[in-house]
UniProtKB/Swiss-Prot annotation:
Role description: Phosphorolytic 3'-5' exoribonuclease that plays an important role in tRNA 3'-end maturation. Removes nucleotide residues following the 3'-CCA terminus of tRNAs; can also add nucleotides to the ends of RNA molecules by using nucleoside diphosphates as substrates, but this may not be physiologically important. Probably plays a role in initiation of 16S rRNA degradation (leading to ribosome degradation) during starvation.
Entry EC no(s): 2.7.7.56
Listed Gene3D superfamilies: GHMP Kinase, N-terminal domain (3.30.230.70)
HAMAP family, per database record: RNase_PH
Subunit structure: Homohexameric ring arranged as a trimer of dimers.
Residues noted as binding phosphate in the record, renumbered to the chain: R86, G124, T125, R126
PROSITE patterns listed in its UniProt record: RIBONUCLEASE_PH
GO molecular function, one term: tRNA binding
Pfam family, one: RNase_PH_C
Keywords: Nucleotidyltransferase, RNA-binding, rRNA processing, Transferase, tRNA processing, tRNA-binding
Protein name: Ribonuclease PH
Cysteine pairings via disulfide bonds: none
Catalysed reactions, semicolon-separated: tRNA(n+1) + phosphate = tRNA(n) + a ribonucleoside 5'-diphosphate
Amino acid sequence: MRPSKRAAQDLRPVTLERNVARYAEGSCLVKFGGTHVLCTASLEDKPPPWLRGQGRGWVTAEYAMLPRATHTRTRRESMSGKPSGRTQEIQRLIGRSLRAVTNLPALGERQITLDCDVLQADGGTRTAAITGAWVALHDCCKWMHGRSIIKEFPLREHVAAVSCGIYQGEAVLDLDYEEDSVAQTDANFVMTGGGALVEVQASAEGAVFSEDELSVLLALAKGGIAQLVNIQKLAIG
């Protein structure tokens, strides 16, 4: 039995609240159960220096956790001078996931930065961030398109992400911290609305896992991401 009493294939309650940041071109407060992430999209009217003159734009991401997002206070990474390896890995993952469904030439020579700040962490912060950041990016693109800054809407399709794992010998979807901290296998899946894979991260924590078990996790993720995409569609109207 899962601590939350959920069935193996059940997501936590998920909400996507748009337009929560007054000044950002797009914003979304995403909640996966007790994990809450604020995602904002900011438009810059220039691309990164290495992309100038190439006629296309860029989508990138930054990720951070507030000091009391966790049970005990965590020192701000900005105080140490640079982001941790974990933070760099997550923000690169978010950026890759969003670029996978974005027509970058349609942006022109512009950059959109997604800032994903974890307000409260209860497992699955990176998957929640990707799912919410897509909504913020969508609204930023809509803002640009509505003002004729761009001629073509640049988002090709949805992208969302979810965690899966093997907890007490059972494959389960969308682990919270209590499950994740003792899971035998931990995996994150990023997929498009059409069901194509963007990224798969899977690690043996307490015991190795088989190809068959990975297939079960993938099937759970497909079902979960289909639900998340439907929630995104309802959120954007």
